[in-house]
Amino acid sequence: MKRFALLFVLALGTALPASADTLADQVRAEAARLLAQVNVASNAAKARPAERPQPVAPALSADMQRFGLAASRLSVEIDQRGGPTDLRCIFRGMSEEADKQLTAAAVAKTGADQAQAYARLTHMLKDAVDIAPAVGGLPPKQTDAAKASAAQCPATRNF
């Protein structure tokens, strides 16, 4: 019974960012929360630059994947609302970058390599905290989703 209660509390705790007012608020809150987790992991990796790094914590991996999904959903929402292409592309890129850097951290051969992947995640998460509020002032959703989804993002940029 205690295990069930613990699982329920953990599930409730992970759902709290999802209760934010809007998807943009959720992305911002999740990014702010993840910054602390990534900072702890980064410091651990920096402490052992030439040694084999610690594995990526399962909680960090799951939380980053959830952030990537929320960023992707926000990109689609911006698209449907006819929002600026640059915002749509930024959040689509964040979704892709979260997965890419999480993979880089997981396969890193040294702490220095892993710290570099975490540094990129930190940079991206700080951008998410700063940029997500700009999505709040978009007009209501368009009814013609096909028109919005036809827009393409320009070439991607590596961090």
Named regions from a protein language model:
Residues 23-95, 101, 117-153:
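Alpha-helical segments in soluble extracytoplasmic regions
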Residues 105-114:
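Membrane-helix boundary connector in multi-pass membrane proteins
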Residues 5-15:
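Bacterial N-terminal signal peptides
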Residues 156-159:
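Short, solvent-exposed mixed-charge patches
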Residues 1-2:
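N-terminal secretory signal peptides that target proteins for export/translocation
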Residues 16-21:
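Sec/Tat signal peptide C-region and signal peptidase I cleavage site
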